[in-house]
UniProtKB/Swiss-Prot annotation:
Coiled coil: none annotated. The keyword Mitochondrion does not apply. Its EC number is 1.-.-.-. Gene3D superfamilies: Nucleotide-binding domain of ferredoxin-NADP reductase (FNR) module, Translation factors. CDD domains: FNR_like. The lineage of its organism: Eukaryota, Metazoa, Chordata, Craniata, Vertebrata. Disulfide bonds: none annotated. The gene is oxnad1. This is Oxidoreductase NAD-binding domain-containing protein 1. InterPro entries: FAD-bd_FR_type (IPR017927), FNR_nucleotide-bd (IPR039261), Oxidoreductase_NAD-binding (IPR052128), OxRdtase_FAD/NAD-bd (IPR001433), Riboflavin_synthase-like_b-brl (IPR017938). The keyword Endoplasmic reticulum does not apply. NAD(+) binds at residues 180-185. It comes from Xenopus laevis.
Length: 314
């Protein structure tokens, strides 16, 4: 999951200087889309990489730690479980793109999982969702082996990678680029974009959202999380929400529904060139090598680095 952010963002300069641990930085002006922080180039040891609290020690967190109860569990893919949590504290809020500290009774390690639902779902139904890939790290392993309906946990919101435009902000087009489970915070952003469009259509007020395109790469179509939800958004907002799915190790036939949206192979500069322009804001989440490659390609297309926001995960 996405656990540490490093970025430069629209109207904010905090630097994109490296790869892993965070350092403090200075906010120069408010961005309609963000929170970002500077990172240095020192690589972390394998033991450090497994400690979410260490990695994010200098990252913004809310003060509220809310009890939460598991009220839904589904298999999003063969390796990813989607968990719905009912949030007890009514003052608990988050911004699209943020993550949670995940506290499990009896499990000493604290998990760090990106939220994959929209802030609007929390406001209307009092729930949020996480999508957690299987691994042996204790919090993720607990979700896959012991988590059940009614399980009680506690969560706290953190993260400086978010999309939170205000009604007075200028219209904005987005590019979202995801690799693997890096889709989680970007799916939250995409759902929030849909909510902004709905609010504008119904009330004529609120932030005037521009267009958004999602580029999403995974090993195969089975590992493209939320793909049907994403296609529903594409169909609900024609021209305003578009997507391009990429698969790198597809061995089975691609179903007819997905075929128009699938490209076999990684996301390339040529793929990006068909949509990217210099006035857009780009969010990227995925493995560090992918992010480094995407940043270079976007800058080759003359997208200013201050408009590229990213979050790296392991």
């Amino acid at each position: 999951m996405a656990l540490v952010a490093g970025s430069a963002a629209y109207q904010v300069l905090r630097g994109v200087t490296g790869t892993f641990p965070t350092q403090s930085a200075t906010l120069l002006a408010r961005a309609p889309a963000l929170c970002a922080h500077t990172m240095n180039r020192r690589r972390m040891s394998s033991s450090q990489q497994t400690d979410h609290l260490e990695r994010t020690a200098n990252t913004f967190r809310q003060e509220i730690i809310s009890p939460a109860k598991v009220c839904g569990i589904t298999n999003e893919s063969a390796t990813v479980k989607r968990v719905r949590l009912a949030i007890a504290n009514r003052e608990f809020t988050f911004k699209a793109g943020q993550w949670v500290d995940f506290f499990i009774p009896g499990v000493p390690k604290v998990g760090g999982f990106s939220i994959c639902s929209s802030p609007g779902l929390l406001e209307t139904e009092g729930v949020l969702e996480l999508a957690v890939k299987y691994n042996l790290h204790p919090p993720a392993h607990w979700i896959h082996s012991q988590c059940a309906l009614g399980s009680e946990v506690a969560i706290r919101v953190g993260g400086e990678f978010c999309f939170d435009p205000q009604p007075s902000d200028l219209p904005l087009d987005l590019v979202l680029i995801a690799g693997g489970v890096g889709i989680n915070p970007l799916f939250s952003i995409l759902l929030h974009v849909a909510d902004l469009h709905k609010t504008r259509e119904i009330t004529g007020r609120g932030f005037q959202m521009g267009n958004v395109k999602l580029y999403y790469c995974a090993k195969n179509t089975g590992e493209l999380l939320f793909k049907r939800n994403i296609l529903d958004l594409v169909n609900s907002f024609p021209g305003k929400v578009t997507c391009s799915f990429h698969v790198t190790q597809q061995s089975s036939p691609i179903c007819r529904e997905l075929q128009p949206f699938i490209t076999e192979g990684r996301i390339t500069e040529k793929d990006l060139a068909s949509y990217v322009s210099t006035d857009q804001l780009c969010y990227i989440c995925g493995p560090p090598p992918m992010i480094e490659s995407m940043c270079k390609q976007l800058q080759s297309l003359h997208l200013p680095k201050e408009r590229i926001l990213f979050e790296k995960w392991w």
